[in-house]
Protein backbone atom coordinates (compact mmCIF):
# COMPACT_ATOMS: atom_id res chain seq x y z
CA UNK A 1 0.00 0.00 0.00
CA UNK A 2 1.39 3.39 -1.00
CA UNK A 3 2.17 5.67 1.92
CA UNK A 4 -0.14 8.67 1.93
CA UNK A 5 2.62 11.26 2.00
CA UNK A 6 6.17 9.92 1.68
CA UNK A 7 7.52 13.48 1.68
CA UNK A 8 6.36 13.94 5.26
CA UNK A 9 8.30 10.81 6.22
CA UNK A 10 11.50 12.08 4.59
CA UNK A 11 11.10 15.56 6.05
CA UNK A 12 10.53 14.27 9.58
CA UNK A 13 13.71 12.24 9.33
CA UNK A 14 15.56 15.36 8.21
CA UNK A 15 14.03 17.29 11.12
CA UNK A 16 15.26 14.67 13.58
CA UNK A 17 18.71 14.83 12.02
CA UNK A 18 18.62 18.60 12.53
CA UNK A 19 17.77 18.17 16.23
CA UNK A 20 20.62 15.70 16.60
CA UNK A 21 22.97 18.08 14.81
CA UNK A 22 22.08 21.00 17.09
CA UNK A 23 22.53 18.82 20.18
CA UNK A 24 26.00 17.66 19.13
CA UNK A 25 27.32 20.68 17.24
CA UNK A 26 28.62 22.42 20.35
CA UNK A 27 31.21 19.64 20.74
CA UNK A 28 34.03 21.09 18.69
CA UNK A 29 37.09 19.51 20.28
CA UNK A 30 38.82 16.28 19.25
CA UNK A 31 40.48 14.13 21.87
CA UNK A 32 43.51 12.43 20.32
CA UNK A 33 45.48 10.51 22.90
CA UNK A 34 46.14 12.89 25.77
CA UNK A 35 45.71 15.97 23.59
CA UNK A 36 42.60 18.00 22.82
CA UNK A 37 42.29 19.98 19.58
CA UNK A 38 39.48 22.00 17.97
CA UNK A 39 37.62 20.44 15.05
CA UNK A 40 34.39 21.90 13.65
CA UNK A 41 32.81 19.61 11.06
CA UNK A 42 29.06 19.17 11.46
CA UNK A 43 27.02 16.99 9.14
CA UNK A 44 24.17 18.66 7.25
CA UNK A 45 20.63 17.82 8.45
CA UNK A 46 19.85 16.18 5.12
CA UNK A 47 22.52 14.11 3.41
CA UNK A 48 22.90 15.17 -0.23
CA UNK A 49 24.20 12.07 -1.99
CA UNK A 50 25.80 12.37 -5.40
CA UNK A 51 25.32 9.53 -7.87
CA UNK A 52 27.37 8.08 -10.68
CA UNK A 53 25.61 8.20 -14.04
CA UNK A 54 25.26 4.95 -15.93
CA UNK A 55 28.42 4.38 -17.95
CA UNK A 56 30.28 7.31 -16.40
CA UNK A 57 33.80 6.60 -15.13
CA UNK A 58 33.74 9.15 -12.34
CA UNK A 59 32.33 12.54 -11.37
CA UNK A 60 35.53 14.49 -11.92
CA UNK A 61 37.24 15.66 -15.07
CA UNK A 62 39.46 12.57 -15.15
CA UNK A 63 43.00 13.13 -16.36
CA UNK A 64 44.05 10.97 -19.24
CA UNK A 65 47.04 9.65 -17.30
CA UNK A 66 46.76 5.86 -17.21
CA UNK A 67 47.52 4.37 -14.85
CA UNK A 68 47.52 6.87 -12.00
CA UNK A 69 50.95 7.26 -10.38
CA UNK A 70 51.66 5.37 -7.19
CA UNK A 71 52.21 8.63 -5.31
CA UNK A 72 51.46 12.33 -5.63
CA UNK A 73 52.30 15.41 -3.57
CA UNK A 74 50.91 18.78 -4.71
CA UNK A 75 53.66 20.51 -2.71
CA UNK A 76 56.14 19.25 -5.30
CA UNK A 77 54.32 21.38 -7.89
CA UNK A 78 54.24 24.53 -5.74
CA UNK A 79 50.46 24.38 -5.35
CA UNK A 80 50.10 24.40 -1.54
CA UNK A 81 49.99 27.42 0.78
CA UNK A 82 51.41 27.25 4.35
CA UNK A 83 49.70 25.34 7.15
CA UNK A 84 47.44 27.53 9.32
CA UNK A 85 46.13 27.21 12.88
CA UNK A 86 42.39 27.28 13.71
CA UNK A 87 43.02 26.98 17.45
CA UNK A 88 40.90 27.26 19.61
CA UNK A 89 37.73 27.50 17.48
CA UNK A 90 35.63 24.94 15.60
CA UNK A 91 36.30 26.44 12.18
CA UNK A 92 38.13 23.62 10.41
CA UNK A 93 35.64 23.63 7.51
CA UNK A 94 36.56 27.21 6.57
CA UNK A 95 40.27 26.36 6.65
CA UNK A 96 39.75 23.32 4.42
CA UNK A 97 37.65 25.27 1.90
CA UNK A 98 40.00 28.27 1.73
CA UNK A 99 43.05 26.01 1.45
CA UNK A 100 41.51 24.49 -1.68
CA UNK A 101 40.84 27.93 -3.20
CA UNK A 102 44.37 29.08 -2.39
CA UNK A 103 45.70 25.99 -4.17
CA UNK A 104 43.59 26.76 -7.25
CA UNK A 105 45.06 30.25 -7.41
CA UNK A 106 48.61 28.91 -7.20
CA UNK A 107 47.88 26.15 -9.68
CA UNK A 108 46.56 28.59 -12.27
CA UNK A 109 49.43 31.05 -11.92
CA UNK A 110 47.60 33.74 -9.94
CA UNK A 111 50.04 33.79 -7.05
CA UNK A 112 49.94 33.02 -3.34
CA UNK A 113 46.93 34.35 -1.45
CA UNK A 114 45.84 34.16 2.19
CA UNK A 115 42.04 34.06 2.49
CA UNK A 116 39.91 34.89 5.54
CA UNK A 117 38.46 31.96 7.47
CA UNK A 118 36.88 34.27 10.06
CA UNK A 119 34.75 36.10 7.49
CA UNK A 120 33.31 32.84 6.17
CA UNK A 121 32.61 31.42 9.63
CA UNK A 122 30.85 34.53 10.96
CA UNK A 123 28.84 35.37 7.82
CA UNK A 124 27.75 31.94 6.58
CA UNK A 125 24.18 32.80 7.65
CA UNK A 126 23.19 29.32 8.81
CA UNK A 127 21.43 28.55 12.07
CA UNK A 128 23.43 27.86 15.18
CA UNK A 129 26.50 29.24 16.87
CA UNK A 130 29.19 29.99 14.30
CA UNK A 131 31.57 27.99 16.51
CA UNK A 132 29.34 24.94 16.03
CA UNK A 133 31.10 24.06 12.81
CA UNK A 134 30.20 23.61 9.18
CA UNK A 135 30.73 21.53 6.07
CA UNK A 136 31.41 21.75 2.34
CA UNK A 137 27.73 22.39 1.58
CA UNK A 138 27.81 25.50 3.79
CA UNK A 139 31.10 26.64 2.27
CA UNK A 140 29.66 26.21 -1.23
CA UNK A 141 26.59 28.30 -0.39
CA UNK A 142 28.70 31.10 1.09
CA UNK A 143 31.11 31.21 -1.84
CA UNK A 144 28.66 30.77 -4.71
CA UNK A 145 26.48 33.67 -3.55
CA UNK A 146 29.64 35.83 -3.63
CA UNK A 147 29.92 36.36 0.12
CA UNK A 148 33.56 35.27 -0.29
CA UNK A 149 36.37 34.62 -0.81
CA UNK A 150 37.78 37.56 1.17
CA UNK A 151 41.44 38.41 1.82
CA UNK A 152 42.82 37.64 5.28
CA UNK A 153 44.21 41.18 5.57
CA UNK A 154 40.65 42.52 5.27
CA UNK A 155 39.34 40.35 8.12
CA UNK A 156 42.14 38.71 10.10
CA UNK A 157 41.57 35.57 12.18
CA UNK A 158 42.94 37.11 15.38
CA UNK A 159 44.42 40.57 15.92
CA UNK A 160 47.64 39.08 17.29
CA UNK A 161 47.80 36.31 14.70
CA UNK A 162 46.77 32.66 14.52
CA UNK A 163 47.62 30.68 17.63
CA UNK A 164 47.41 33.74 19.90
CA UNK A 165 44.78 31.99 22.04
CA UNK A 166 45.37 28.70 23.82
CA UNK A 167 43.24 25.66 23.10
CA UNK A 168 41.12 26.26 26.21
CA UNK A 169 40.65 30.02 25.63
CA UNK A 170 37.53 29.67 23.50
CA UNK A 171 35.58 32.31 25.45
CA UNK A 172 38.29 34.93 24.92
CA UNK A 173 38.55 34.11 21.22
CA UNK A 174 34.79 34.30 20.78
CA UNK A 175 34.70 37.62 22.62
CA UNK A 176 37.17 39.10 20.13
CA UNK A 177 35.13 37.86 17.18
CA UNK A 178 31.68 38.78 18.46
CA UNK A 179 32.27 41.96 20.44
CA UNK A 180 35.60 43.59 19.74
CA UNK A 181 35.98 42.81 16.05
CA UNK A 182 32.85 41.41 14.36
CA UNK A 183 32.94 40.62 10.66
CA UNK A 184 31.03 42.72 8.15
CA UNK A 185 30.10 41.82 4.56
CA UNK A 186 32.92 42.63 2.18
CA UNK A 187 33.27 42.61 -1.55
CA UNK A 188 34.87 39.26 -2.41
CA UNK A 189 38.42 39.23 -3.68
CA UNK A 190 37.56 36.21 -5.82
CA UNK A 191 34.24 34.93 -7.15
CA UNK A 192 33.73 31.16 -7.01
CA UNK A 193 31.99 29.88 -10.14
CA UNK A 194 32.34 26.09 -9.95
CA UNK A 195 32.25 23.42 -7.24
CA UNK A 196 33.41 19.88 -8.01
CA UNK A 197 31.91 17.19 -5.74
CA UNK A 198 33.88 13.94 -5.50
CA UNK A 199 32.08 10.65 -4.70
CA UNK A 200 32.41 9.35 -1.15
CA UNK A 201 35.14 6.83 -0.52
CA UNK A 202 33.61 3.40 0.01
CA UNK A 203 36.66 1.15 0.13
CA UNK A 204 36.66 0.42 -3.59
CA UNK A 205 39.43 1.20 -6.06
CA UNK A 206 36.88 3.07 -8.18
CA UNK A 207 36.13 5.77 -5.60
CA UNK A 208 39.78 5.89 -4.56
CA UNK A 209 40.70 6.68 -8.16
CA UNK A 210 37.99 9.36 -8.26
CA UNK A 211 39.68 11.20 -5.41
CA UNK A 212 43.16 10.69 -6.83
CA UNK A 213 42.06 12.11 -10.18
CA UNK A 214 40.59 15.18 -8.47
CA UNK A 215 43.81 15.75 -6.52
CA UNK A 216 45.94 15.51 -9.67
CA UNK A 217 43.60 17.79 -11.62
CA UNK A 218 42.98 20.44 -8.95
CA UNK A 219 45.80 20.01 -6.44
CA UNK A 220 43.66 19.86 -3.29
CA UNK A 221 40.26 18.59 -2.13
CA UNK A 222 38.34 19.51 1.05
CA UNK A 223 37.34 16.29 2.84
CA UNK A 224 35.67 15.23 6.08
CA UNK A 225 37.18 12.75 8.53
CA UNK A 226 36.91 11.42 12.06
CA UNK A 227 39.75 12.79 14.17
CA UNK A 228 38.48 12.11 17.70
CA UNK A 229 39.79 8.72 18.75
CA UNK A 230 42.14 8.46 15.78
CA UNK A 231 45.20 6.33 16.49
CA UNK A 232 48.30 8.36 15.67
CA UNK A 233 51.97 7.60 15.41
CA UNK A 234 54.44 10.17 14.12
CA UNK A 235 52.60 11.65 11.15
CA UNK A 236 50.36 8.63 10.45
CA UNK A 237 46.67 8.57 11.44
CA UNK A 238 44.06 5.82 11.21
CA UNK A 239 40.46 5.57 12.42
CA UNK A 240 38.63 2.24 12.18
CA UNK A 241 35.49 2.94 14.20
CA UNK A 242 31.88 3.76 13.27
CA UNK A 243 31.35 7.23 14.76
CA UNK A 244 30.56 10.10 12.41
CA UNK A 245 32.94 12.67 10.95
CA UNK A 246 33.97 15.58 13.18
CA UNK A 247 36.82 17.31 11.31
CA UNK A 248 37.44 18.89 7.90
CA UNK A 249 40.90 18.74 6.33
CA UNK A 250 42.54 19.19 2.93
CA UNK A 251 43.92 16.22 0.99
CA UNK A 252 46.84 17.11 -1.30
CA UNK A 253 48.28 13.76 -2.32
CA UNK A 254 48.68 10.04 -1.70
CA UNK A 255 51.22 7.22 -1.43
CA UNK A 256 50.17 3.71 -2.38
CA UNK A 257 53.24 2.29 -0.63
CA UNK A 258 52.98 4.08 2.72
CA UNK A 259 53.68 1.15 5.07
CA UNK A 260 50.88 -0.17 7.24
CA UNK A 261 53.52 -0.60 9.95
CA UNK A 262 53.75 3.21 10.26
CA UNK A 263 50.36 3.30 12.02
CA UNK A 264 49.81 2.75 15.74
CA UNK A 265 47.01 0.33 14.89
CA UNK A 266 48.03 -1.62 11.81
CA UNK A 267 45.44 -1.30 8.98
CA UNK A 268 44.70 -4.19 6.57
CA UNK A 269 47.13 -2.90 3.94
CA UNK A 270 49.60 -0.26 2.79
CA UNK A 271 48.68 3.12 1.34
CA UNK A 272 47.70 6.52 2.70
CA UNK A 273 46.34 9.93 1.81
CA UNK A 274 48.55 12.99 2.35
CA UNK A 275 46.59 15.70 4.16
CA UNK A 276 47.15 19.29 5.25
CA UNK A 277 45.67 19.93 8.70
CA UNK A 278 44.74 23.25 10.34
CA UNK A 279 46.35 22.88 13.76
CA UNK A 280 49.61 24.68 13.06
CA UNK A 281 53.05 23.44 12.09
CA UNK A 282 53.70 21.79 15.46
CA UNK A 283 50.92 19.29 14.87
CA UNK A 284 52.38 15.81 14.37
CA UNK A 285 55.94 15.24 13.21
CA UNK A 286 55.69 16.55 9.62
CA UNK A 287 54.96 20.25 10.07
CA UNK A 288 51.17 19.93 10.19
CA UNK A 289 50.87 17.33 7.41
CA UNK A 290 49.61 13.79 8.00
CA UNK A 291 49.19 10.48 6.23
CA UNK A 292 45.74 8.93 6.69
CA UNK A 293 45.32 5.24 5.89
CA UNK A 294 43.40 4.16 2.79
CA UNK A 295 41.50 1.88 5.16
CA UNK A 296 40.26 4.68 7.42
CA UNK A 297 36.51 4.11 7.83
CA UNK A 298 35.42 7.76 7.84
CA UNK A 299 37.92 9.66 5.69
CA UNK A 300 36.29 11.22 2.61
CA UNK A 301 32.75 10.09 3.39
CA UNK A 302 30.88 13.44 3.19
CA UNK A 303 30.83 15.04 -0.28
CA UNK A 304 34.47 15.99 -0.75
CA UNK A 305 34.72 19.24 -2.71
CA UNK A 306 36.88 21.48 -4.88
CA UNK A 307 36.08 25.21 -5.13
CA UNK A 308 37.08 26.85 -8.42
CA UNK A 309 37.62 30.65 -8.68
CA UNK A 310 36.35 32.52 -11.71
CA UNK A 311 38.49 32.82 -14.79
CA UNK A 312 38.83 36.29 -16.37
CA UNK A 313 36.06 35.32 -18.80
CA UNK A 314 33.79 34.42 -15.86
CA UNK A 315 34.32 37.64 -13.91
CA UNK A 316 30.68 38.70 -14.09
CA UNK A 317 29.25 41.89 -12.63
CA UNK A 318 26.23 40.57 -10.73
CA UNK A 319 24.72 37.30 -9.57
CA UNK A 320 20.98 36.61 -9.25
CA UNK A 321 19.68 33.73 -7.18
CA UNK A 322 17.24 32.67 -4.49
CA UNK A 323 19.38 29.74 -3.30
CA UNK A 324 21.26 31.77 -0.72
CA UNK A 325 21.96 28.64 1.32
CA UNK A 326 22.91 26.38 -1.56
CA UNK A 327 21.86 22.79 -2.06
CA UNK A 328 20.12 21.84 1.18
CA UNK A 329 17.66 19.29 -0.16
CA UNK A 330 17.01 17.33 -3.34
CA UNK A 331 13.56 17.63 -4.87
CA UNK A 332 12.26 14.38 -6.36
CA UNK A 333 8.93 13.03 -7.48
CA UNK A 334 7.85 11.37 -4.25
CA UNK A 335 8.11 14.63 -2.31
CA UNK A 336 4.72 15.75 -3.63
CA UNK A 337 1.74 13.43 -3.31
CA UNK A 338 -0.89 15.69 -4.80
CA UNK A 339 -2.44 14.95 -8.23
CA UNK A 340 -1.38 15.45 -10.94
CA UNK A 341 2.20 15.59 -9.65
CA UNK A 342 3.16 11.92 -9.96
CA UNK A 343 5.68 11.97 -12.82
CA UNK A 344 9.41 12.39 -12.10
CA UNK A 345 10.34 16.03 -11.71
CA UNK A 346 12.84 17.07 -14.39
CA UNK A 347 12.25 20.84 -14.55
CA UNK A 348 13.16 23.79 -12.36
CA UNK A 349 13.13 27.50 -13.04
CA UNK A 350 13.75 30.89 -11.48
CA UNK A 351 12.32 34.30 -12.38
CA UNK A 352 14.30 37.51 -11.87
CA UNK A 353 13.94 41.21 -12.66
CA UNK A 354 16.97 43.07 -13.97
CA UNK A 355 18.04 46.06 -11.93
CA UNK A 356 19.40 48.17 -14.76
CA UNK A 357 20.67 47.86 -18.31
CA UNK A 358 22.75 44.72 -18.38
CA UNK A 359 23.49 41.57 -20.37
CA UNK A 360 22.67 38.05 -19.22
CA UNK A 361 25.92 36.17 -19.82
CA UNK A 362 25.71 32.84 -17.98
CA UNK A 363 23.64 30.62 -15.70
CA UNK A 364 24.69 28.37 -12.84
CA UNK A 365 23.18 25.11 -11.65
CA UNK A 366 23.71 22.49 -8.95
CA UNK A 367 23.72 18.86 -10.04
CA UNK A 368 24.00 15.58 -8.11
CA UNK A 369 24.72 13.26 -11.04
CA UNK A 370 28.22 12.66 -12.39
CA UNK A 371 27.04 13.17 -15.98
CA UNK A 372 23.76 14.93 -16.69
CA UNK A 373 22.42 16.12 -20.08
CA UNK A 374 20.47 19.37 -19.91
CA UNK A 375 18.57 21.99 -21.84
CA UNK A 376 18.54 25.59 -20.61
CA UNK A 377 16.03 28.11 -21.92
CA UNK A 378 16.00 31.86 -21.28
CA UNK A 379 12.69 33.75 -21.56
CA UNK A 380 12.45 37.54 -21.45
CA UNK A 381 9.49 39.79 -20.57
CA UNK A 382 7.73 37.01 -18.69
CA UNK A 383 4.64 37.75 -16.61
CA UNK A 384 5.38 38.29 -12.94
CA UNK A 385 3.79 36.02 -10.32
CA UNK A 386 2.31 33.75 -12.99
CA UNK A 387 1.48 30.06 -12.65
CA UNK A 388 4.44 29.13 -14.85
CA UNK A 389 7.89 30.69 -15.31
CA UNK A 390 7.37 31.10 -19.06
CA UNK A 391 3.95 32.78 -19.12
CA UNK A 392 3.94 35.77 -21.48
CA UNK A 393 7.64 35.41 -22.20
CA UNK A 394 9.65 35.30 -25.39
CA UNK A 395 12.25 32.56 -25.86
CA UNK A 396 15.55 34.45 -26.14
CA UNK A 397 18.03 31.59 -25.99
CA UNK A 398 18.18 27.83 -25.71
CA UNK A 399 21.36 25.87 -25.08
CA UNK A 400 21.98 22.15 -24.59
CA UNK A 401 24.91 20.24 -23.17
CA UNK A 402 26.02 17.77 -20.52
CA UNK A 403 27.13 18.58 -16.99
CA UNK A 404 30.38 16.66 -16.62
CA UNK A 405 30.54 16.45 -12.84
CA UNK A 406 28.45 16.59 -9.70
CA UNK A 407 28.44 19.93 -7.89
CA UNK A 408 27.88 23.42 -9.26
CA UNK A 409 28.62 24.51 -12.83
CA UNK A 410 28.57 27.94 -14.46
CA UNK A 411 27.39 27.65 -18.06
CA UNK A 412 28.15 30.58 -20.39
CA UNK A 413 25.47 31.45 -22.92
CA UNK A 414 26.40 31.40 -26.64
CA UNK A 415 25.87 35.16 -26.79
CA UNK A 416 24.90 37.74 -24.13
CA UNK A 417 21.20 38.57 -23.92
CA UNK A 418 20.47 42.32 -23.55
CA UNK A 419 18.21 43.14 -20.61
CA UNK A 420 16.73 46.59 -20.35
CA UNK A 421 16.21 48.06 -16.91
CA UNK A 422 13.40 46.22 -15.02
CA UNK A 423 13.13 43.35 -17.50
CA UNK A 424 11.58 40.24 -15.96
CA UNK A 425 13.29 37.11 -17.27
CA UNK A 426 13.33 33.42 -16.42
CA UNK A 427 15.93 30.67 -16.46
CA UNK A 428 14.44 27.22 -17.16
CA UNK A 429 16.52 24.09 -16.56
CA UNK A 430 15.34 20.81 -18.08
CA UNK A 431 16.95 17.42 -17.56
CA UNK A 432 17.22 15.44 -20.77
CA UNK A 433 18.47 11.95 -21.56
CA UNK A 434 17.43 8.70 -19.91
CA UNK A 435 17.99 9.57 -16.22
CA UNK A 436 15.35 12.25 -15.82
CA UNK A 437 14.71 11.25 -12.21
CA UNK A 438 18.03 12.80 -11.15
CA UNK A 439 17.11 14.78 -8.00
CA UNK A 440 16.75 18.53 -8.50
CA UNK A 441 18.63 20.68 -6.00
CA UNK A 442 16.97 23.29 -3.84
CA UNK A 443 17.37 25.45 -0.77
CA UNK A 444 14.83 24.65 1.92
CA UNK A 445 13.97 25.77 5.44
CA UNK A 446 16.43 23.38 7.10
CA UNK A 447 18.92 25.21 9.38
CA UNK A 448 18.45 28.38 7.31
CA UNK A 449 15.74 30.80 6.17
CA UNK A 450 15.63 31.31 2.37
CA UNK A 451 12.68 33.78 2.47
CA UNK A 452 11.14 32.71 -0.83
CA UNK A 453 8.12 34.49 -2.37
CA UNK A 454 5.56 33.28 -4.88
CA UNK A 455 6.54 33.72 -8.50
CA UNK A 456 10.27 33.30 -7.97
CA UNK A 457 11.08 29.59 -8.04
CA UNK A 458 9.35 26.68 -9.81
CA UNK A 459 9.59 22.90 -10.15
CA UNK A 460 7.84 20.66 -12.64
CA UNK A 461 7.91 17.82 -15.13
CA UNK A 462 7.94 17.78 -18.90
CA UNK A 463 4.72 17.26 -20.79
CA UNK A 464 4.50 14.28 -23.14
CA UNK A 465 2.62 13.64 -26.39
CA UNK A 466 2.13 17.34 -27.03
CA UNK A 467 0.98 18.16 -23.50
CA UNK A 468 2.23 21.26 -21.74
CA UNK A 469 4.80 21.13 -18.97
CA UNK A 470 3.35 20.91 -15.46
CA UNK A 471 4.67 23.41 -12.91
CA UNK A 472 4.32 24.10 -9.20
CA UNK A 473 5.50 27.22 -7.41
CA UNK A 474 8.26 26.46 -4.92
CA UNK A 475 6.66 28.87 -2.44
CA UNK A 476 3.20 27.27 -2.69
CA UNK A 477 3.19 25.77 0.77
CA UNK A 478 -0.22 24.15 0.37
CA UNK A 479 1.29 21.84 -2.24
CA UNK A 480 4.81 21.57 -0.88
CA UNK A 481 3.17 20.68 2.45
CA UNK A 482 4.17 21.27 6.04
CA UNK A 483 6.72 19.76 8.39
CA UNK A 484 5.39 19.39 11.94
CA UNK A 485 3.24 22.54 11.54
CA UNK A 486 6.21 24.47 10.08
CA UNK A 487 5.81 25.85 6.58
CA UNK A 488 8.59 25.02 4.14
CA UNK A 489 9.44 26.30 0.69
CA UNK A 490 11.83 25.16 -2.02
CA UNK A 491 14.12 27.60 -3.84
CA UNK A 492 15.57 26.17 -7.05
CA UNK A 493 19.36 26.10 -7.15
CA UNK A 494 19.64 28.16 -10.34
CA UNK A 495 21.63 31.37 -10.67
CA UNK A 496 21.96 34.01 -13.39
CA UNK A 497 25.08 36.07 -14.09
CA UNK A 498 25.17 39.41 -15.86
CA UNK A 499 27.55 42.01 -17.23
CA UNK A 500 26.65 45.63 -16.61
CA UNK A 501 25.97 47.89 -19.59
CA UNK A 502 24.72 50.93 -17.65
CA UNK A 503 26.51 54.17 -18.48
CA UNK A 504 26.67 57.48 -16.68
CA UNK A 505 24.24 60.12 -17.91
CA UNK A 506 26.84 62.80 -17.21
CA UNK A 507 30.56 62.89 -16.39
CA UNK A 508 31.73 59.79 -14.61
CA UNK A 509 35.00 60.99 -13.10
CA UNK A 510 35.28 62.95 -9.84
CA UNK A 511 35.55 66.63 -10.73
CA UNK A 512 33.16 66.47 -13.67
CA UNK A 513 29.51 67.53 -13.59
CA UNK A 514 27.76 64.40 -12.38
CA UNK A 515 25.80 65.99 -9.53
CA UNK A 516 22.15 65.03 -9.34
CA UNK A 517 22.29 62.31 -11.99
CA UNK A 518 20.37 59.20 -11.01
CA UNK A 519 21.31 55.58 -11.65
CA UNK A 520 20.31 52.20 -10.32
CA UNK A 521 22.80 50.29 -8.20
CA UNK A 522 22.31 46.53 -7.92
CA UNK A 523 23.43 45.59 -4.44
CA UNK A 524 24.26 41.88 -4.56
CA UNK A 525 22.32 39.29 -2.60
CA UNK A 526 23.84 38.62 0.81
CA UNK A 527 26.24 41.55 0.86
CA UNK A 528 23.59 44.10 -0.07
CA UNK A 529 23.23 46.42 2.90
CA UNK A 530 22.75 43.24 4.87
CA UNK A 531 22.23 43.87 8.55
CA UNK A 532 25.39 42.64 10.26
CA UNK A 533 24.58 39.95 12.82
CA UNK A 534 27.22 41.26 15.23
CA UNK A 535 26.94 45.02 15.68
CA UNK A 536 25.12 47.72 13.78
CA UNK A 537 27.43 48.47 10.85
CA UNK A 538 26.03 48.08 7.37
CA UNK A 539 28.12 46.86 4.46
CA UNK A 540 27.31 46.88 0.77
CA UNK A 541 28.86 46.79 -2.63
CA UNK A 542 27.72 47.96 -6.03
CA UNK A 543 29.08 47.60 -9.53
CA UNK A 544 28.79 50.94 -11.34
CA UNK A 545 31.30 51.61 -14.08
CA UNK A 546 31.20 54.64 -16.34
CA UNK A 547 31.00 54.54 -20.11
CA UNK A 548 34.72 55.20 -20.42
CA UNK A 549 35.67 52.66 -17.77
CA UNK A 550 36.59 55.31 -15.21
CA UNK A 551 35.31 55.55 -11.67
CA UNK A 552 31.68 56.37 -10.96
CA UNK A 553 30.87 57.60 -7.46
CA UNK A 554 27.51 57.30 -5.75
CA UNK A 555 25.77 58.03 -2.47
CA UNK A 556 22.82 56.21 -1.01
CA UNK A 557 20.86 57.62 1.93
CA UNK A 558 19.06 55.70 4.64
CA UNK A 559 17.64 56.66 8.00
CA UNK A 560 14.61 56.97 10.19
CA UNK A 561 13.27 59.92 8.25
CA UNK A 562 14.40 60.50 4.65
CA UNK A 563 13.18 64.11 4.84
CA UNK A 564 15.54 64.86 7.73
CA UNK A 565 19.15 65.25 6.46
CA UNK A 566 20.48 64.89 10.00
CA UNK A 567 19.04 61.40 10.22
CA UNK A 568 20.55 60.04 7.02
CA UNK A 569 23.02 57.23 6.55
CA UNK A 570 25.34 58.11 3.65
CA UNK A 571 27.03 55.33 1.72
CA UNK A 572 29.77 56.30 -0.74
CA UNK A 573 30.58 53.74 -3.41
CA UNK A 574 33.60 53.81 -5.70
CA UNK A 575 34.34 51.31 -8.46
CA UNK A 576 37.77 51.35 -10.07
CA UNK A 577 38.55 48.78 -12.76
CA UNK A 578 35.59 46.75 -11.59
CA UNK A 579 36.72 46.69 -7.93
CA UNK A 580 34.36 48.55 -5.57
CA UNK A 581 35.34 50.30 -2.36
CA UNK A 582 33.04 51.72 0.30
CA UNK A 583 32.81 54.38 2.95
CA UNK A 584 29.83 55.40 5.04
CA UNK A 585 28.88 57.99 7.64
CA UNK A 586 27.95 57.96 10.36
CA UNK A 587 28.89 54.64 11.93
CA UNK A 588 25.70 53.00 13.13
CA UNK A 589 25.91 52.36 16.85
CA UNK A 590 23.94 50.13 19.19
CA UNK A 591 22.11 53.11 20.71
CA UNK A 592 19.63 53.58 17.85
CA UNK A 593 17.37 51.48 15.73
CA UNK A 594 17.58 52.33 12.04
CA UNK A 595 15.00 51.65 9.39
CA UNK A 596 16.37 51.36 5.89
CA UNK A 597 14.48 53.39 3.31
CA UNK A 598 15.01 51.43 0.15
CA UNK A 599 13.17 50.75 -3.04
CA UNK A 600 11.53 47.39 -3.58
CA UNK A 601 10.59 46.54 -7.20
CA UNK A 602 11.29 50.08 -8.37
CA UNK A 603 8.54 51.30 -10.74
CA UNK A 604 9.45 53.63 -13.63
CA UNK A 605 8.42 56.73 -11.68
CA UNK A 606 10.19 55.69 -8.48
CA UNK A 607 8.15 55.13 -5.34
CA UNK A 608 9.94 54.64 -2.07
CA UNK A 609 8.90 52.04 0.48
CA UNK A 610 10.06 51.15 3.95
CA UNK A 611 12.25 48.05 4.16
CA UNK A 612 13.00 46.99 7.76
CA UNK A 613 16.65 46.24 8.33
CA UNK A 614 15.93 42.74 9.67
CA UNK A 615 14.52 41.79 6.27
CA UNK A 616 17.54 42.85 4.25
CA UNK A 617 19.80 39.94 5.16
CA UNK A 618 17.27 37.41 3.86
CA UNK A 619 16.39 39.18 0.61
CA UNK A 620 17.82 37.72 -2.57
CA UNK A 621 18.10 40.87 -4.67
CA UNK A 622 17.22 44.45 -3.90
CA UNK A 623 17.77 47.56 -5.97
CA UNK A 624 18.30 51.08 -4.70
CA UNK A 625 18.25 54.47 -6.39
CA UNK A 626 21.49 56.36 -5.93
CA UNK A 627 22.56 59.91 -6.72
CA UNK A 628 25.89 60.63 -8.38
CA UNK A 629 28.03 63.38 -6.92
CA UNK A 630 31.45 64.96 -7.31
CA UNK A 631 33.14 62.95 -4.57
CA UNK A 632 36.87 62.75 -4.14
CA UNK A 633 38.86 59.76 -2.77
Please identify what each model-predicted range represents.
Residues 502-633:
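Short, composition-biased motifs enriched in small/polar/acidic residues
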Residues 99, 106, 146-150, 227-230, ...:
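Acidic glycine-/aspartate-rich tracts in secreted/extracellular proteins
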Residues 429-502:
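Short, surface-exposed beta-strand/loop patches at domain edges
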Residues 1-14:
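N-terminal secretory signal peptides that target proteins for export/translocation
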Residues 30-35, 72-76, 311-343, 502-534:
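Boundary/junction segments of secreted and surface-exposed precursor proteins
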Residues 67-74, 78, 94-102, 114, ...:
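Predominantly the structural core of cysteine protease catalytic domains
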Residues 371-456:
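Aromatic- and Gly/Pro-enriched, solvent-exposed loop/edge beta-strand patches characteristic
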